[in-house]
């Protein structure tokens, strides 16, 4: 890859890094992706509602949370036409490049950022070199800025290559809240896709190390549950109330006692509780946010069913009502060995690659599995590839950063894999 091409990848990544946006509010990010696609020159660009199955969106925020981000994008110069197409939380893009007869290959990457205040320390490179987040309280702390740069670089490299076939790049919104994968999977854009790839940078793999395909991403469900009781004076007549706080506390304690399953690992966590009004008032309403995970989709469903049973039992014990609601979820889908082999063989020939791991357990959750499942259920193959990158601190921390040398490695591996698949089917 030329020096100019490497520099462009770095510039792209830094542009995305400066303008992080949370799930379903990635208006500037969507606009920048479209701008770059138009520069590259692709055959089709589907934006917003054209890129999604609207009714399948999950964890969509309220309008009053979306509107400030749309207004910010308008002030930044995003066109009224694009904002109209993405308004109401309909971000996302699908680009299609057609280059003759051959396989249809999909590449999925994610658009959104995380609610973290980025470090202002001088030894934090984005601060030192002038590309720290300009959106206070939000940051690309998981590498999605790198994913976007790699995807756009791959698309341009494939266009300039001997690739024969169709390449679809799916820029998915709302990965961090597991909200966009299902909507993009059911959009129709995966119809006819033979091979689908997703990618992630880092995850404790250094620059030059590649994982050709992950196994066992944990299936996951986010839930919220609101306990409704009756308020009363906590000193004079506590017996006249129905204590929603006590019901929630019982539910939380018992959630961690869900029996382990013989078929594999499960996880449960209650990460947030909110409710009540004063120490002398029996709490009338309390809301908790929880999640369950499982080594398989069936195990996640088991944990979710058990958690819901506990919620209802705790509510009944304290004469309360409870309304659990699944906000978002994602399945467990493994990478296909045939694609792992192709990626691994290609990676060994890419400049900068020092170590190739055929497969490893993922250990976290990822709603890109919806897209993988959609393709595999239709008879195609899918793989989730890890591109190593040196990062000074862990993902989801204020000082997270990447080694930009890994961008070119990611582009070269993916583009050369796609060319190889257009020549020889596994």
Segments from the language model and where they lie:
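Metal-dependent amide/peptide-bond hydrolase catalytic core
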Residues: 246-426
């Amino acid at each position: 890859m030329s020096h100019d091409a490497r520099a462009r990848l770095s510039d792209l990544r830094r542009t995305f890094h400066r303008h992080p946006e949370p799930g379903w509010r990635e208006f500037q990010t969507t606009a920048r992706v479209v701008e770059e696609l138009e520069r590259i020159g692709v055959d089709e660009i589907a934006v917003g509602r054209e890129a999604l199955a609207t009714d399948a969106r999950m964890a969509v925020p309220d309008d009053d949370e979306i509107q400030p981000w749309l207004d910010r994008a308008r002030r930044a110069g995003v066109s009224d036409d694009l904002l109209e197409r993405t308004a109401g939380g309909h971000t996302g893009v699908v680009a299609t490049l057609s280059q003759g007869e051959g396989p249809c290959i999909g590449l999925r990457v994610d658009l959104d950022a995380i609610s973290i205040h980025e470090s202002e320390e001088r030894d934090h490179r984005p601060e030192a070199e002038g590309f720290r987040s300009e959106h206070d309280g939000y940051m690309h702390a998981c590498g999605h800025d790198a994913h976007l740069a790699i995807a756009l670089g791959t698309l341009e490299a494939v266009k300039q290559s001997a690739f024969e076939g169709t390449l679809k790049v799916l820029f998915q919104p709302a990965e961090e809240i597991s909200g966009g994968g299902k909507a993009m999977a059911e959009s129709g854009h995966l119809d006819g896709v033979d091979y689908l790839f997703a990618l992630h940078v880092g995850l404790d793999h250094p620059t030059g190390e590649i994982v050709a395909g992950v196994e066992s991403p944990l299936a996951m469900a986010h839930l919220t549950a609101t306990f409704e009781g009756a308020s009363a004076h906590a000193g004079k007549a506590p017996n006249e109330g129905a204590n929603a706080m006590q019901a929630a506390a019982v539910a939380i304690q018992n959630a961690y006692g869900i029996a382990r399953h013989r078929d594999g690992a499960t996880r449960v966590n209650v990460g947030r509780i909110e409710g009540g009004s004063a120490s002398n008032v029996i709490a009338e309403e309390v809301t908790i946010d929880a999640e369950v995970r499982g080594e398989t989709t069936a195990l996640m469903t088991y944990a979710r069913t058990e958690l819901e049973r506990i919620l209802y039992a705790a509510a009944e014990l304290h004469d309360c009502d409870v309304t659990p609601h699944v906000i978002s979820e994602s399945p467990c889908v493994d990478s296909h060995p045939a694609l792992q082999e192709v990626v691994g063989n290609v990676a060994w020939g890419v400049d900068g690659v020092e170590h190739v791991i055929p497969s490893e357990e993922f250990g976290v959750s990822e709603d890109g599995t919806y897209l993988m499942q959609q393709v595999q259920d239709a008879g195609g193959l899918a793989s989730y590839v890890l591109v190593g990158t040196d990062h000074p601190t862990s993902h989801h921390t204020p000082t997270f950063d990447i080694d930009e040398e890994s961008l070119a490695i990611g582009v070269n591996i993916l583009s050369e894999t796609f060319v190889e698949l257009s020549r020889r089917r596994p």
